[in-house]
Amino acid sequence: MAFVNTLLRTIRCSAVHTLVQEGRSLSLLKASHQLTQSRKIMLSNHVRKEEAKSEPNETLDLEEWKSILKSDIGNAEMVKTETQEDSSLNEMQELVEMWRLAGRAVPQSITTEQLQVLMELPTKTARKKYLKYLSVREVMKTNRKEKKKELKESKSKIESLDQLETKEDTPEKKNTFLLHVWDKSIDTMQRWKCVQAMKFGQPLVFDMVYEKNMSRYELENTVCQLMESEGWNRRSTDPFHIYFCSLQPYSMYHKELVKRYIGAWDNVFVTATDKSHVEMFPKEQLVYLTADSPNELKHFDHTKIYIIGSLVDRCQQTGLSLANAKRLNLATARLPLDRYLKWDVGAKNLTLDQMIRILLCLKDTGDWKKALSFVPNRKHDGFAEPAASKKRNIKNDGGMEYAASTKRNLQKNSKMYKFGASKSFIKPERTDDTSIRSTRKRWWEEEN
């Protein structure tokens, strides 16, 4: 287009110069000017029509425009908050490094999650305590790793020596008639049992409403016990269908469980819900197990749904779970520890994994002695012997007379005072024989 216009201009200018030199009239100039202009306009109109065809009319949507503007503003705010968080995290990192240089108890490596927890703490003393706790935990972790390494090295040395001895003595046995069971097949079998329990098994509820009644350390310990309980349940022959009731999303319980399971939380065969156990099951079937209950659990009922409070055993808050059960009008029960164990001193609080092992054993066998063997020996002095009480069925008069005569004989034969049982305090028998009395001498006769 531009090339055509320039070409026309050059032709027109050359024509004007020739006409002026020859002395022609101006009418020809006007005609040539109109002709050149009309050609130029025709070309431009044609191009405009093509542009109009290629670019159709688009109507502007105001709501879309508003949403785009809002999203841009939100993104800008997000970027600002992220930059602020990064700056605050960097400041906390610098503060931790300064305290480390000052010689305070600070861990050598700290994660972003720990830095965020450190930022949320309100006071300086709380931050110091948390850093000290992290440093102590780090030292314990390193000590454990060193011990494991030493044990592995010692085991490897012993195994190498044993292998050398066996090679010298006997040849290796490669073939066997026993079928090797792989770990993968065992895992699939356990998962299949858990799936069947989730479909047809007896429910067991863990009440997750005690988050505010525990510190962070106690909550982490509780989550560890919950994971052990899930493992024992998965490995049992007849597992429970475990429910985590009142587990709020993004709560401390939920965050710690997701963190400990390392991406496998969605694959765990457990029903986690934010509803309470009262909303999930009928109240008539619920029994809350608590150590403060006045009712003793005499036998395991397969039709009931037992509830265990997710409290760590170190958090000895007496009456907390019992008050929660009474508030909801639920039946309560406690394990018969006094009846079967010599438990004189100390709180009767057990860990969550011990509770589920006791309940699994009761479910399979119904034997209290076998079930209570999972209670640690440091908490009691052994099993209590059953009292050997001989009960007589007295139905006739002869039986009544026999009982009365035995009672009289016992009263006659009891010759001991109440304050002692030694032989020096035995009462002498009274005799009515006067000859024996006459032979005895008085104290005034002995002097004469």
Swiss-Prot record:
GO biological process: methylation; mitochondrial tRNA 5'-end processing; mitochondrial tRNA processing; mRNA processing
EC number of the protein: 2.1.1.-, 2.1.1.218, 2.1.1.221
A GO cellular-component term linked to this record: mitochondrion
Residue ranges that the Swiss-Prot or TrEMBL entry lists as coiled coil: 137-165
Gene source species: Xenopus tropicalis
PROSITE patterns: SAM_MT_TRM10 (PS51675)
Organelle transit peptide residues: 1-48
Keywords, alphabetical: Coiled coil, Methyltransferase, Mitochondrion, Mitochondrion nucleoid, S-adenosyl-L-methionine, Transferase, Transit peptide, tRNA processing
EC class of the enzyme, as a word: transferase
Region of interest (Disordered), residue spans: 144-167, 429-448
Stated role: Mitochondrial tRNA N(1)-methyltransferase involved in mitochondrial tRNA maturation. Component of mitochondrial ribonuclease P, which cleaves tRNA molecules in their 5'-ends. Together with hsd17b10/mrpp2, forms a subcomplex of the mitochondrial ribonuclease P, named MRPP1-MRPP2 subcomplex, which displays functions that are independent of the ribonuclease P activity. The MRPP1-MRPP2 subcomplex catalyzes the formation of N(1)-methylguanine and N(1)-methyladenine at position 9 (m1G9 and m1A9, respectively) in tRNAs; trmt10c/mrpp1 acting as the catalytic N(1)-methyltransferase subunit.
Reaction equation(s) it catalyzes: adenosine(9) in tRNA + S-adenosyl-L-methionine = N(1)-methyladenosine(9) in tRNA + S-adenosyl-L-homocysteine + H(+); guanosine(9) in tRNA + S-adenosyl-L-methionine = N(1)-methylguanosine(9) in tRNA + S-adenosyl-L-homocysteine + H(+); an adenosine in mRNA + S-adenosyl-L-methionine = an N(1)-methyladenosine in mRNA + S-adenosyl-L-homocysteine + H(+)
Family: Belongs to the class IV-like SAM-binding methyltransferase superfamily. TRM10 family.
Domain SAM-dependent MTase TRM10-type: 190-382
Example of a GO MF term: tRNA (guanosine(9)-N1)-methyltransferase activity
Protein name in the entry: tRNA methyltransferase 10 homolog C
Subcellular location: Mitochondrion matrix, Mitochondrion nucleoid
Subunit structure and binding partners: Component of mitochondrial ribonuclease P. Interacts with HSD17B10/MRPP2.
InterPro entries: MT_TRM10-typ, MT_TRM10-typ_sf, Trm10_C_MTase_dom, tRNA_m1G_MeTrfase_euk, tRNA_MeTrfase_TRMD/TRM10
Pfam families with a match to the protein in the record: tRNA_m1G_MT (PF01746)
